[in-house]
């Protein structure tokens, strides 16, 4: 977040609470199975909290459930210390289903649920998921990149993430 000096002061709770569109942290936790506890609002899924309008409630804690999954996160930046052009977090559940989260689009992060396709080879699965996300995602433009560039990156990062997670699965099976 911002520069190195401020990044060393940033907290997970602050990043989750603010729900910034460029947050790497929010993108990663949205791919996981998480809830948040709000002082007035009680416990609710992080996915629901991330879509809510801003309010003045206090974030008490982030609850990370111990759901078995493989997770892979990546981002594209114009420079190492810059905020991201696009972020991607992918989770492969034990069932083979996928949860892909795309952030810094530059809108708030969005999550896609994709069903398992056991009949497809890893390369085909990755290409299919990448095309699906490119067709569905809404991106915007700013000084870091155009909407078209971000849409293209969403497909590329999704494909890389699925290939990585499928490769991990094959290594575990050996």
Model-derived regions: residue spans:
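C-terminal structural segment of proteins
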Residues: 1-174
């Amino acid at each position: 977040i911002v520069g190195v000096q401020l990044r060393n002061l940033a907290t997970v709770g602050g990043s989750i609470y603010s729900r910034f569109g460029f947050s790497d942290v929010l993108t990663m936790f949205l791919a996981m199975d998480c809830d948040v506890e709000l002082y007035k609002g009680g416990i609710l899924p992080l996915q629901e909290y991330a879509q809510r309008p801003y309010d003045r409630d206090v974030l008490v804690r982030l609850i990370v459930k111990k759901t078995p999954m493989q997770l892979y996160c990546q981002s594209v930046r114009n420079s190492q210390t810059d905020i991201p052009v696009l972020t991607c977090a992918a989770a492969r559940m034990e069932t083979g289903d996928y949860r892909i989260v795309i952030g810094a689009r530059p809108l708030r992060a969005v999550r896609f649920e994709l069903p398992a396709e056991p009949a497809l080879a890893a390369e085909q699965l990755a290409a299919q998921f990448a095309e699906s996300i490119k067709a569905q995602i809404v991106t915007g433009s700013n000084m870091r990149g155009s909407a078209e560039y971000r849409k293209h990156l969403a497909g590329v990062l999704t494909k890389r993430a699925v290939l990585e997670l499928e490769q991990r699965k094959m290594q575990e099976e050996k």
